[in-house]
């Protein structure tokens, strides 16, 4: 059985804000951000344990092409819960 990605409300809000920001910056950049996230979500789903545990059983995956990190946990029943998608250039991060 394959892993299933589930977005928390906070992660969905983080993504919405980032897409709006990137679309204001340049037409189509928000879509590129979403496409990049899809690729990284697939990588996480394929091998979730490849990302290191950084704090409180939360794993972090760094995105190469955008200044963001994906924070997630591995739950029972093959669920991967995306907790946050943080912009590493903004403070505070939480």
State what each model feature region is.
Residues 31, 69, 73-94:
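Enriched for short, Lys/Arg-rich terminal
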Residues 66:
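ATP/adenylate-binding site constellation spanning eukaryotic-like Ser/Thr protein kinases
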């Amino acid at each position: 059985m394959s892993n299933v990605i589930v977005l928390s409300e906070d992660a969905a809000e983080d993504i919405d804000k980032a897409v709006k920001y990137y679309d204001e910056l340049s037409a189509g950049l928000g879509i590129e951000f979403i496409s990049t996230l899809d690729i990284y979500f697939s990588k996480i789903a394929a091998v979730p344990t490849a990302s290191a545990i950084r704090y409180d059983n939360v794993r972090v995956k760094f995105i190469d092409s955008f200044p963001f990190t994906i924070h997630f946990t591995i739950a029972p029943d093959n669920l991967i819960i995306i907790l946050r998608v943080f912009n590493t250039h903004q403070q505070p991060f939480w």
